[in-house]
Amino acid sequence: MTELPDNTRWQLWIVAFGFFMQSLDTTIVNTALPSMAKSLGESPLHMHMVVVSYVLTVAVMLPASGWLADKIGVRNIFFAAIVLFTLGSLFCALSGTLNQLVLARVLQGVGGAMMVPVGRLTVMKIVPRAQYMAAMTFVTLPGQIGPLLGPALGGVLVEYASWHWIFLINIPVGIVGAMATFMLMPNYTIETRRFDLPGFLLLAIGMAVLTLALDGSKSMGISPWTLAGLAAGGAAAILLYLFHAKKSSGALFSLRLFRTPTFSLGLLGSFAGRIGSGMLPFMTPVFLQIGLGFSPFHAGLMMIPMVLGSMGMKRIVVQIVNRFGYRRVLVATTLGLALVSLLFMSVALLGWYYLLPLVLLLQGMVNSARFSSMNTLTLKDLPDTLASSGNSLLSMIMQLSMSIGVTIAGMLLGMFGQQHIGIDSSATHHVFMYTWLCMAVIIALPAIIFARVPNDTQQNMVISRRKRSL
């Protein structure tokens, strides 16, 4: 890193800044949801669409981001991503209704979807390949700090200012980032093949309509027959994409990916697994504030052990997988995450609050080992010619499954909490207890898929740093 020219180091700082903005916004909102609900006159049990709208938009837009960067230029697209993200933040802060806030989050999601993948592409173009890993480690470090800082910062802003400030703080930072991008970042472009617009539209419509059908009756009052029609339309769009991909050589995602058994199994397991684990970052701060009466700041602080556990486990997960194998690790962590979720609910409802940080630390560790194992299992056997496409599809599936998970969590809360419930009341405790029990079952189910993972054929390489001799 020290051998790089000054202008290249500045460009890496810009990319790192984008990673930080996107990762911070992913976690800072969850802590503020109950306060948003009170301000907007909504039930806190129906605020999940604020999260779903952002994550689903990221999932829909991810496949287009890389092509746009190659065609229009990394500087232009990264600049546009920061501008859209900043404008979305402004509109979020100005929102007076839940529907306005959801639409503003969609605009934010368009910017967020382009920021991270285009940032990775930028690093690949501006640094020598030998220094790529060191550069990516540098730019992704702020992205790891964002989830650690987000919940606590969100709690402070909500408790001592208002929820609007979790979006307003993005505006001056976004303006500086956009100006730096425009002035310092080169606009690399390359020849691109024709974009698969029909395939993109089919996937986008299928994902959006199926998610809407899953939650439409609770959040929008859509009739059952209309929901059935939406579900059928979404499924038809996905099936039409499969037919299109089979016939087209330039499809967005080639069906040749699924000839690799571990990719097919890993992708299915990742989709099912992240539906369950995607509920936890949304449900935990809502449960702490609405179910137990914690302040926003206290609830935000309680999320920090979970992030610390996740970051700490990443250092040893490769050794664990090499020792026990993918199948055992994935089955054990999947069932373990379900049990830890039940333990968290039990400890909280029993009033043993001093144990909550320890339980959340354990939850973060188990979840991190599971995530890392799912990701590497999915991609490890793909040929080089399909690795980029497979990684893009996995990224899209990760975001889609998280949005479905939050949608299901909101649906469960709405189903068990039909009438208005008070903070830290007996009725509220029952609503969250039934919801967490259902979540534990959903989290545990992917163990059936992971039990079919074949035996490992080779071990993963452990990257270690040699100590310099004195």
UniProtKB/Swiss-Prot annotation:
InterPro entries the UniProt entry points to: MFS (IPR011701), MFS_dom (IPR020846), MFS_trans_sf (IPR036259), Multi-R_MdtD (IPR023721)
Membrane topology (UniProt): Multi-pass membrane protein
Locations listed in the record: Cell inner membrane
Periplasmic topological segments: 1-11, 70-76, 125-137, 186-196, 246-262, 307-341, 417-430
Molecular function, one GO term: transmembrane transporter activity
Family named by the database record: Belongs to the major facilitator superfamily. TCR/Tet family.
Protein name according to UniProt: Putative multidrug resistance protein MdtD
Organism: Salmonella paratyphi A (strain AKU_12601)
Upper taxonomic lineage: Bacteria, Pseudomonadati, Pseudomonadota, Gammaproteobacteria, Enterobacterales
